[in-house]
């Protein structure tokens, strides 16, 4: 993942989600809110309220993000998030799958709602993020991101 130097990190209301795991149920149009996602707040990258990457290490540099997840409808799931091979987030013994199906999406997601208030007539600034090596695997060493030189 790469945020160019011109990414609008000083735009205070801006809090884009850059990837998320979504769940949905058979027969329902609405999805559950994502339980696992990364969000940029003033140039820092967070998983909920846990800092994953500081601004000085996020903007203008390539960063490798890896998720290790045990998907479960019971309280035996876990989540680990690695930044450049360093464990930055770990949570165990919680429900990680809240629907019948799961999908992963990445890009820049800004929306009005979810507890975020934007000023009246707020205009979202131009934003660019580059992604490379996005993949899923049963083993970390088989992820595409681990084969990029």
Per-segment meaning from a language model:
Residues 10, 32, 61, 73-75:
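Short loop/turn segments at connectors of secondary-structure elements within structured domains
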Residues 45, 81:
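Short aromatic-centered micro-motifs
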Residues 71-79, 88-90, 141-142:
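Substrate-binding/catalytic groove segments of enzymes
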Residues 46-66, 71:
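Short, aromatic/His-centered strand-loop micro-motif at the edge of beta-sheets
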Residues 1-42, 108-111, 115, 123-148:
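Secretory/extracellular carbohydrate-interaction modules
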Residues 83-105:
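Short, solvent-exposed beta-strand-to-loop segments that form ligand-recognition rims
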Residues 2, 61-68, 82, 130-135:
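Residues within well-ordered beta-strands of beta-sheet-rich folds
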